[in-house]
Amino acid sequence: MIQFSGRACLRQGWKCAAGVGLRCHGAHSSPPLHVPPFRRYTATYSRADETGHIDTAPNESVFYFDSVLPVKALFSRRFAPLDLAPSMTGRIGNLIIKLTGATPLNVIGRAFPLELQENIQQVIPRYSEGGAFVKLSHPPNMDKEGLSSLLNTHLEQNPLKLWFSPFTSVRASLVRGRPWLEDLQRSPSSRIKVEFLPTSPGASSVELTPELLYSLSRRYGKLADIIPQPSDSKIQPRYALLDFTRPSYAVIAKNCLHGYKVSASEGGGSAGTLLKLSYERKLKPHVIRGWIVSHPRIVIPIIAAVIAAITVIVFDPIRTFFIKIQIAPPIDVQDNRLWQWIQRQASKANDILSLRQRQRSDSRGLKAIWEDRKEDIQRLQTWLLEATNTFTVVHGPRGSGKKELVLDEVLKGYRHKLVIDCKPIQEARGDSATINAAAAEVGYRPVFSWMNSISSLIDVATQTLGANAGLSETLDSQLGHILQNTANALKKVALEKKRWDGKDSHMTDEEFLEAHPECRPVVVIDNFLYKANNNPMIYEKLSDWAAALTVSNIARVIFLTGDISYSKTLSRALPNQIFHEIQLGDCTPDVAKQFVLDHLHTDQSNSSSYTQAGPDTIEGGDIKDLEDCIEVLGGRLSDLEFFARMISRGQSPSDAVHDIIVQSAAEILKMYIADVDNTVRNWTPEQAWYLVSSLAEAQGGSILYSEALFSDLFKKDGESTIRALEQAELISVTTLNDRPSTIKPGRPVFAAAFRRLLEDDVLRCRLGLRTLGQQIAMENANINKYEGELQVLGSLEKEPKEIRPRVRWLLEKLAGSQAKIEKYEKESVGLRRILQSKM
């Protein structure tokens, strides 16, 4: 509490900003506390804080001044959990009013006439209510009513409006009761509860009428309503509610009327009635929480909308920024010479410490490949500069160098590019993992994929109430949101030149993008249609998104795929368009040989720890052996690179090829024949073995597409089975005039692996027996069907002549099936004999 003694300050000769000499003192300090001239007051705690009341002499009165402090309800709730000490409360209050300059002393000094300023005895600020109590002595020949009239007249003639309350003047009201100066956690309210208490123990009190309450409280502000206690209420003591139009009016009434004794002449009963005033909340405690809990159908959708709005407003710009950084890094360290030098030095240090060959990138020895595919590279670069709105598709089997061709050669000078690999997205398990994988590919962060699981649980809970909260999002919608943010970032990157270069400022964004195709970033979608049967929705979203980018001239889109059915998916997204297509196959033997030699030469020049087989060793030895090995191995880049790596480790070419063939045979046996789950894969081991054995025995290493399709094993869904085996890369289907023509091994080395598997008599006999058993079962099923129909026809009383051709046909079919069964049985006997002899 703060006390100010006016006379003492005059005796000391100090002057304050209001023109009143003041000295500040505390009730517990006996000697006076001298304050420097530049310090306006000192915070102390007087007896009023301890008792909660202001003691007055007969010649003293107390007035309440409203709108004195700028901060209201500061200590009512905001610091409730802190349990601030009185000294701390005073220091905070002092700091606030010092910073604002609206000290109670300054305001009250300006509110009093000059002739009354020396009568100020005590100033008690009320921080929580924005006002202050002032105790002053009566001038000679003036009572409290006259003093109140004098103050009000002065304030009417000289209105005092402070900067924090420009529309409200300071008011002075005579305190008629005995105010309770509590420091409880109670915030002011526009509603006052008036309790009617007896003036002394054992006495009785009366309930004041609304008319009497109006006459007592109207002087402090306009009333909105007076609510008496219901007559049937048994709550004691009796009370009434006063609703003021403003909370400030209620504050004045509470501070001036609390403790007022209504005499008998005023209507307070024979013994009088004591008024006890307190703030009353218009809303009951926890009413908002109760309403929220009882109305989940309304509240939960609102919460969902708020969360969505916050996500869009706050996080979407951040996510777009991170995506933009991934598309166009502010500092391209890959082309920086210093960064490249640091990488080289770090690699050399790693070689020395690990005593092993430095691992280089997969682009070693690719110069010969790029020379052979120079025409394809130039064609792709030309397409990127054209203004046509269509897709560019680079198709080729896995390991044919599609990604290296596009990123290392075609887009070598492009700074603004985005690579999206579909493989980690498809291999992710669960919606959350899929969202994280998709976000990582484009740089979309922060990602709150775990929120979707929580939201799903909330949706399940709310559905029991008959409502759908709509908090959880489907995988489709979340992927769409990621792609939409990526499109926004791509558009910003494409328009960077327009923003920095003022030449095209007169153009709209669409006109600029159409006129400057060279400014469009490039989006490379790798492994397109990888495991498309698992989750085709992802590829539908990607193709639709890529079509929108292409049509809007925002970006160029290049698809890298090994699936020959890509045109079906892309044509749905971008119909009536001819795609730019590049078909990458295997290298020719000469290019493959040069690739291996260049690869070995690079390895030899970088070797510093041990001797390796290099091109000199091979060329000096048996170059014919290398050529023969490459002819067996084929021109697949991944196999050639593995072959060169094995030679660089010291193996001979023949040993390296032998190891690759053995490894490929084991891979075929495990992936396509031995561990086949028919519920997951669309082929049986017998169907895979039929193609393996047929291709191993075929002249030229290929069979006709119709030959496999007309086999008994492929009578049911034969085309879909062959397509599934092609997607699994066991075989490859070549086309002629846009129709399937021949079937070849999926990789050139598979031809030798097929022959190796067929040379294994035990494996050949076991799988042959399984195949023959399946064929016998199929023929038995046909015979049962024929016999059933013959039985139906034979049950007729008279045999019509019209059914005789049908009966003859059924008998021929039955005989043919029986002949096949006998043939299969004879082959089975031979295979069993071989198997018994080998085992």
Swiss-Prot record:
It is found in: Mitochondrion inner membrane. Residues 769-838 form a coiled coil. Keywords: Coiled coil, Membrane, Mitochondrion, Mitochondrion inner membrane, mRNA processing, RNA-binding, Transit peptide, Transmembrane, Transmembrane helix. The chain crosses the membrane at residues 298-318. Residues 319-839 are mitochondrial intermembrane. InterPro entries: Mt_escape_2_C, Yme2_C, Yme2_RRM. Residues 190-282 form the RRM domain. The keyword Transmembrane applies. GO terms for biological process: mitochondrial genome maintenance; mRNA processing. Its main location: mitochondrion. Residues 43-297 are mitochondrial matrix. GO terms for molecular function: RNA binding. Residues 1-42 form a transit peptide. It is a single-pass membrane protein. GO terms for cellular component: mitochondrial inner membrane. It comes from the Eukaryota. Plays a role in maintaining the mitochondrial genome and in controlling the mtDNA escape. Involved in the regulation of mtDNA nucleotide structure and number. May have a dispensable role in early maturation of pre-rRNA. PANTHER family: MITOCHONDRIAL ESCAPE PROTEIN 2. Belongs to the YME2 family. This is Mitochondrial escape protein 2. It comes from Coccidioides immitis (strain RS) (Valley fever fungus). The gene is YME2.
